[in-house]
C-alpha cells in the first residue's frame, strides 16, 4: 500500500482499533500488571470525555495535564481529543513560577494533576497558586489571579478540598447522554489543535506550541513506518509523555499502527529492563542517559532482551560508541530523530535499514511529505551539499503557530512557509543530515531545552549579583549542563550553595546551574 498522510483525528484512530482489534492489548504497565485492551481503553476514554463535558470542557477548551506517565495520562489526552479540547502538557519538573506562567499564558480552564514528584508537591503548589481552592466547592472555583481556571482534577482516588478526583469525574459523566458525546465528536477536525506544549523554542521565554491532530498523528505514523512497525510490535515507553518524544514519537506511533504500548511511569532502568523481559518488547525509546543507565545497571545481564529489534535514541547528542553498545548488547537497530516541538517533532529520521554508520553518525533523512533545507542564515539561499547552514522545514509537520503570539510565529516561519530551527546542519550527497551546532545559545541538558536568558533574569533578583551570564558546560552524562558566570557587587561574597538554594523550588531542577563561577 502506498504511504500517504492520513486525515483521521486521534479519536478516530482510537475507535478504529477498538472496532477492528478490540481484544488486543493496547496499554500495559508491566510492573503492576495493569492491562487495557483497545476496546477497554476506548470505553474508559468515552466515559472520561463525558465527565469532561459535564464540567464545562468543550471544543477548544484548554485542559492542563501535569503528571508523570500514570495510567490515566493517556485517558485524559484522548478524552480531550475526542471532544475537540486541547491538552496542554505540563513539564513534571515545573515549580511555582513556571506553573503560574503557564496557567495564565495558556488560558487553562481545567488542570489535571497528580501528587507530584519527589522534590515538589503539585497539590501544595496548586493551593499556593489558588488560595480560594480550599474554600471552593468543586466546579465553582473563582480565582482572582486566574479567572479562566474553573476546575482542578486530581488524577487518582484521593480526595482534596476543592478538587474533583477521577472517580467523581467518571460519575458525573454518567449524566451526559451518548448523543451529546457523539455530537461533540462530530465537531472535531483533524486540523484542529489537540496538543499544546510549552518550549523555549529557538528564542525567548516559553511559548505554547500549537500542534494539530494531523501534525502529531502523521509524525507518529511515518516514524513507525521508518522502523517497519506493525500491529505485532510492543513499544516500551520510558520517556515522559509531556514531551513530544513520549506523546508523539511513542504514543502516536502506537496509535497509528495498532500495536501495544508498554509504559513506565517514571524512569527506572530496572523497571525498563524487567518490562522488556516480561512483555517481550520489540522496541525501546530513550534519551542517551537512559540507555547508559540501563546498560550500566548491575542486573542488566539477568534480563533477556533478544525480543528487541529497533528503537529511537534522541533528545540530545547521541554518542556513536553508546549507539554501538546498544546495538551489540540490546540487540536493537537504533535510529535517531532530529526535530523540534515546533515540527511535531520529527524533521529527520534514520531508517531501520540504513547502514550502521549512517544511523550512528547522522540524524537520518527528511520525512516524507516535507522539505528540509539547509539555508545560509546571512543570505537566505539554500546551501550546497556539504556546506553548513540553518536547518529549516516545510510540510505537514510544522506547528500551527505559537499560542496568542503571531509575532513570535512570524519570526520562525518565513514567508515561504519554512520553519527556522536555529540549529546548524550539513546535508551530504546521499541526503543524510548532520547537526553541527546552534545559531542561538540554547542549552540542551539530557533532552531538556534550557534557555539561558530565563535563568539569567531570575538570578538577577539574587541580592549581591551585579551581572550574570549562563552558558552550556559539556557533560558526559547529560550532553550539556548549565553553568552560571556571576559578577558580584563590590564587597559581596557568595557560595555555590547560596545560588542553588535561591533556585530550588522556584525554577525546574534541570535549569538550576550545576557549575557556578564567580
Predicted regions, residues:
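AMP-dependent adenylate-forming
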Residues: 13-37, 159-160
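Conserved AMP-binding/adenylate-forming core of the ANL superfamily
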Residues: 26-70, 74-78, 95-100, 165-174, ...
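Conserved AMP-binding A3 loop
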Residues: 35-39, 185-187, 191-218
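Structural core segment of the AMP-binding/adenylate-forming
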Residues: 83-171, 490
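AMP-binding/adenylate-forming catalytic core of the ANL superfamily
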Residues: 94-104, 113-115, 284, 395, ...
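Conserved AMP-binding/adenylation subdomain of ANL enzymes
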Residues: 217-234, 242-283, 291-293, 297-298
